[in-house]
Amino acid sequence: MTITDLVLILFIAALLAFAIYDQFIMPRRNGPTLLAIPLLRRGRIDSVIFVGLIVILIYNNVTNHGALITTWLLSALALMGFYIFWIRVPKIIFKQKGFFFANVWIEYSRIKAMNLSEDGVLVMQLEQRRLLIRVRNIDDLERIYKLLVSTQ
């Protein structure tokens, strides 16, 4: 096993740990989930480039008769990238005292102002940062509003 294979195993383990945390651990942290809203995905061009580069590496490894374990590890990395970027749905998870947005816990007390833009983006102003929340279904904005009013 080469250093390349060890690095590939490390990246696969990191992506797998992130996927497990995102799917199973995060929804159970900080109390029961009051509301989970699916969000719009950002540009997918980055994911296409990532998976495309991995496919090029697989092709290069096969044509140069590289190690079979490296080909399998590259394939596993491509599948993990495909899952993370294309299958997994980003979401905002509301709890009793705060919410998870982009896997970061934000307490309700940190929200200084909220606005709704013309194109349906909820803008939350924190102390030093703005959150742009793009929901998949525009009706979910009303559900978020009702939840925030009832918890504040």
Swiss-Prot record:
Transmembrane segments: 6-26, 45-65, 67-87
GO CC, one annotated term: plasma membrane
Native organism: Escherichia coli O157:H7
HAMAP family associated with the record: UPF0266
Parts of the chain on the Periplasmic side: 1-5, 66
Cytoplasmic topological domain residue ranges: 27-44, 88-152
Compartments, as annotated in UniProt: Cell inner membrane
Family per similarity comment: Belongs to the UPF0266 family.
InterPro entries on file: DUF986
Membrane topology: Multi-pass membrane protein
NCBIfam families attached to this UniProt entry: PRK02913.1
Protein name (record): UPF0266 membrane protein YobD
Alphabetical UniProt keywords: Cell inner membrane, Cell membrane, Membrane, Transmembrane, Transmembrane helix
Pfam families in alphabetical order: DUF986 (PF06173)
